C-alpha cells in the first residue's frame, strides 16, 4: 500500500477530453453513491461527498474543454480525492454494480460505464422517498447556481427529477455516449447485464 498520493495537475494536462469526462463523472458517482448509501453512511462521508461534488461539478466542463486549465484540473483532482475518501467510508452501490459487467463483457471503460447508467439508476432509486430526499440534498452541490433558479418551492421528487435532467444534459455536453447502443451493446445483452449486476451483493 502506498504511503502517500501526490495530486499534480500538471500530469493530467494531456488527458484527452473524453477520458477527462468519463473519469470526472466516475468521481461524481463515487460521491453520489457514498452519500445515498444504505451501508455505513455517516457524517464524515457525507461532508466529503458534498464538497467533492461541488468541486467536481463546477470544474468538469472547464477541465474537458480547456485541458491546460490547471485550476480546473487541480480542483478535479481534489474533488476526486474527497469522493474517494467518501466511498472508502460509505460504499458505492447500484451504478457500480451495473457498470462492472459492462466493462467485463464489452470492455467499456469504467467511467463511461458509470456515466451510461447513472441517470437511470437515480431515476429508479428516486421512487423511494428517502433516496429522493438525499438526491435533493445533493442538488445544490451538483447544480451550483442552476439550483437556485429551478428549485424554489418544489418537492424533493421534483428537485431530483430536475437534478437528473441536469446531469443528463451535462453528460451530453461532454460528448460521452448516452445510450448502450451507441457503444455497440445489443439489446439482448440487457438481461445478462442485469443478472450479473445482481451478483454484486456487497454493493446492493
Regions found by a protein language model. Name each.
Residues 51-54, 92-93, 166-175, 193-197:
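Short acidic alpha-helix initiation/capping motifs at coil-to-helix transition points
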Residues 81-114, 200-204:
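Glycine-rich phosphate/pyrophosphate-binding beta-alpha loops
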